[in-house]
Amino acid sequence: MKPSILEKLQQLGDRLEEVTHLLGQPEATSDMDNYRKLTREHAELTPVVEVFQNYRLAQSDLADAEEMLSDPEMKDFAAEEIEAAKAKIDELDTELQKLLLPKDADDDKNIFIEIRAGTGGGEAALFAGDLLRMYSRYAERNRWQVEIVSANESELGGYKEVIARIVGLGAYSRLKFESGGHRVQRVPATESQGRIHTSACTVAVMPEADELEDIELNPADLRTDTFRASGAGGQHINKTDSAVRITHLPTGMVVECQDGRSQHANKAQAMKVLAARLNDAQKREVQAKEAAERKSLIGSGDRSERIRTYNYPQGRVTDHRINLTLHKLDFVMDGDLAEITDALIAEHQAELLAAMGD
């Protein structure tokens, strides 16, 4: 392990002692904001320091085993102990480097997920509906909540565009690599000749802004239009101009919300989506630069990139960024995404570790 990393770990250990001392003071709870901040820092530092303690213990075991080598009667035993200690040190070294990777401040946040039908017309809209169900089922598996924010339904079923909000700790960390082009190959229900068609959808995953203050929205930059909501919602929703369209004039971004029961609710939700989109645009600009520097295919924020193909006749899913192919399409479409998301996170961590070593 590099001396600079060892020094950093020692500093973290010292800081944990300091934070523990501060939390133990009688006046610690007099400033609740600072108390919460210290508690959060304590929770973040503890696992790193514990692994570092185990690392130093393994190093001590290695030194003890090497001393035993000089004893002829203990030589074989010592050799086994040395091998075990070295393996443990390597394992803990890797774990420590992962723990020291820079944290994405958005990882624990709720998300907005936008799914837009692309090439393929009605079939693409149906696939957008399938993707929404896939992410909704994945959310259920994680005990997250799903709310439909805005939906532009297709005449044949599915969606031309749908925006959902997923509420749950770590939602962004698990789904942030889903942004990009998703392609489906299958025989449409309307196809009488049994020919396979290719359709596509674009997915955008955006962390929800903590507060609207995170993004400075100048009222002069916004144009708000109201109109009558269409689609489901009963009699009341179509009698008033409850739907809201907000246009961000500097960027041309347009957000529509009409699924709420009032104009006020729709405007509030539209502002949240707009804030998330503006935050996301800034984040993707930074990600693209960082990804280009390390020649990364994951986390580049490039929405035009085709990231995954769902082939129904062959029952397979292929993620093109990491050359991962799974022959369990039905399970994936039912929300069994863990194998894919785990592999993407692992690859992203490996890229960051490689960058740390450069």
From Swiss-Prot:
Q: Name one GO cellular component term.
A: cytoplasm
What does UniProt say on post-translational modification here?
Methylated by PrmC. Methylation increases the termination efficiency of RF1.
Specify one Pfam family.
Answer: PCRF
Compartments annotated for it: namely:
Cytoplasm
| Residue(s) carrying N5-methylglutamine | Q235
Record-linked NCBIfam families: prfA (TIGR00019), PRK00591.1 (NF001859)
The entry assigns this protein to a family as follows: Belongs to the prokaryotic/mitochondrial release factor family.
Question: Could you tell me which PANTHER family the record lists for this protein?
Answer: LD18447P
What is the name attached to this protein's record?
Peptide chain release factor 1
Organismal lineage? Bacteria, Pseudomonadati, Pseudomonadota, Betaproteobacteria, Neisseriales
- Gene this protein is translated from: prfA
